Curated annotation (Swiss-Prot):
It comes from Pseudomonas putida (strain ATCC 47054 / DSM 6125 / CFBP 8728 / NCIMB 11950 / KT2440). This is Glutamate--tRNA ligase. Coiled coil: none annotated. The gene is gltX. InterPro entries: aa-tRNA-synth_I_cd-bd, aa-tRNA-synth_I_codon-bd_sub2, aa-tRNA-synth_I_CS, aa_tRNA-synth_I_cd-bd_sf, Glu-tRNA-ligase_bac/mito, Glu/Gln-tRNA-synth, Glu/Gln-tRNA-synth_Ib_cat-dom, GluQ/Sye. HAMAP family: Glu_tRNA_synth_type1. A motif ('HIGH' region) lies at residues 10-20. The keyword Nuclease does not apply. One of its GO terms (biological process) is glutamyl-tRNA aminoacylation. One of its GO terms (molecular function) is zinc ion binding. ATP binds at residue 254. Its main location: cytoplasm. The keyword Cytoplasm applies.
Length: 493
């Protein structure tokens, strides 16, 4: 009997997302319920955004939750390497096989040519897609351009008509017209694969039998299915999980909810409660109980109990469930966990240099730096009153800084400062006009340790959470203001 093998393949391009943890949990439970294996693979082909720091955060977040893997970059295994950036020769080999078999082709089109192609198609009311012009080149011309070292990509051929049937374990057969599919790039001009080629090659070579992934990938499933057909490989069983959503039913995003697992760890949530809550996202126990452990979820896991309705990720409900777990702990364990959370040595070492020179006794540390150990702060609206800025300008400054910080890929003091500086310059203000607002929102005080250092230490999700909290306190942002300020944001370098 074939061993069930599932996997999670996150990209190390930022803080570990609760959506990644959600998909990892369901893959883990499915594998373990069938006595199988769970694999961790790192999709780091985006060389500009991928970092080893983010990769380590993924490891730490999953382990904090209690999700362990049988094979992966840090534990090894018989199917490595488990980082896509280390598998370049493998992808090149299989891409060349597709070209030689007539299933893929070299494309030398420049970015300017592709942009013009899209513009002309849109002007005609057509859906933008590659028009196949590279297929008109002779074999001799292709070889000449390859020999000359011209930049190129490799694209897959796709049918221009007909229907692709996607067998989904949750929805049954899903029919998707081929004319919606583009001639997907498989190998980029930097020699690295795109998601589609790497995904299929890796899943096959690593013996993945079942793929549980987010439903946002369902519309592009025909490309993956066609690649399996081209290679002559058996495709894994496919299961497209419903997406996590905000309480307003929009797709879960950091603009409306903290999305980093690290944020919830920092806020003092229990990993058992977090897993329990993620397990209830579109799934339920046979007896409908609300509180259950990872082991209990594995024991009773059944895909047929997954609901296709968009599961709502609600922090208030998560907090309620966390309280259930917290209050049922033995007092000794509660005290031990509290100590481990509050006096985490790594976190303390980040904070200590910023408070040590400002206190005379240890008892003064809490009033000065207590905000480092809090989640939501009790903010005072009076702290946001400004002699130079109107109430509307105060909200505008905070909102624009929040938006700029949301686009920040590397969370470093210098880059945080750059975001704030860019906003104040665009508004023709001084840095000293904005910093009191940052102190008020981030520390809950008029002055404290360097607020820029504090923002770096607190991390992106908690920083953004507090800025949103400040905006809510000050009355929020109207739809009209949101529209106007987003236009202004687009002009800020």
């Amino acid at each position: 009997m074939t061993t069930v093998r599932t996997r999670i393949a996150p990209s190390p391009t930022g803080d570990p997302h609760v959506g990644t943890a959600y998909i990892a949990l369901f893959n883990y439970c499915f594998a373990k319920q069938h006595g199988g294996e769970f694999i961790l693979r790192i999709e780091d082909t985006d060389q500009l955004r991928s970092t080893r720091e983010s990769e380590q955060q993924i490891f730490d977040a999953l382990r904090w939750l209690g999700i362990e893997w049988n094979e992966g970059p840090d534990v090894g295994g018989p199917h490595g390497p488990y980082r896509q950036s280390e598998r370049g020769e493998i992808y090149a080999k299989y891409a060349k096989e597709l070209v030689d078999a007539g299933h893929a082709f070299y494309c030398f089109c420049t970015a300017e040519e592709l942009e013009q192609m899209r513009a002309e198609q849109q002007a005609r009311g057509e859906t933008p897609r590659y028009d196949g012009r590279a297929l008109l080149m002779s074999a001799e011309e292709v070889q000449r351009r390859l020999d000359a070292g011209e930049p190129h990509v490799i694209r897959m051929k796709v049918p221009s008509e007909g229907i692709c049937v996607v067998p989904d374990m949750l929805r049954g057969d899903v029919e998707i017209p081929w004319d919606r599919m583009d001639m997907q790039v498989l190998m980029k001009n930097d020699g690295l694969p795109t998601y589609f080629l790497a995904n299929v090659v890796d899943d096959h070579l690593m013996g993945i039998t079942h793929v549980l992934r987010g439903e946002e990938w369902l519309p592009s499933a025909p490309k993956l299915i066609k690649l399996y057909e081209y290679f002559g490989w058996e495709q894994p069983k496919l299961c497209y999980m419903p997406l996590l959503r905000n309480p307003d039913k929009s797709k879960l995003s950091k603009r409306k909810n903290p999305t980093s697992v690290t944020f919830y760890e920092r806020m003092g949530f229990m990993p058992e409660a977090m897993l329990n809550y993620l397990g209830r996202m579109g799934w339920s126990m046979p007896d409908e109980r609300e509180k259950f452990s990872l082991a209990e979820m594995v024991e009773h896991f059944d895909l047929s109990r997954i609901s296709l309705g968009g599961p709502i990720f609600d922090i208030e409900k998560l907090s309620w469930l966390n309280g259930q777990w917290l209050r049922e702990l033995p007092v000794e364990e509660f005290a031990a966990r509290l100590q481990k959370w509050a006096f985490n040595s790594d976190y303390m070492m980040k904070i200590a240099p910023h408070v040590q020179g400002r206190v005379e006794t240890f008892s003064q540390v809490a009033p000065l730096g207590g905000f480092f150990f809090e989640g939501a702060l009790k903010l005072d609206a009076k702290l946001f009153e400004s002699k130079k800025l109107s109430a509307d300008q105060v909200r505008q400054v905070i909102q624009l800084i929040l938006w700029k910080l949301e686009s920040l890929r590397q969370w470093e003091k210098e880059r945080i400062t750059g975001c704030i500086q860019a906003v104040v310059e665009a508004l023709e203000l001084k840095l000293r006009d904005a910093m009191p607002l940052m102190f008020a929102a981030i520390t809950g005080q008029a002055s404290s340790v360097s607020v820029l250092d504090a923002m770096e230490i607190l991390g992106p999700d908690l920083t953004r959470y507090r800025l949103r909290q400040a905006l809510d306190l000050l009355g929020g942002v109207s739809k009209k203001e949101n529209k106007e300020w987003e236009k202004l944001l687009a002009s800020i370098a």
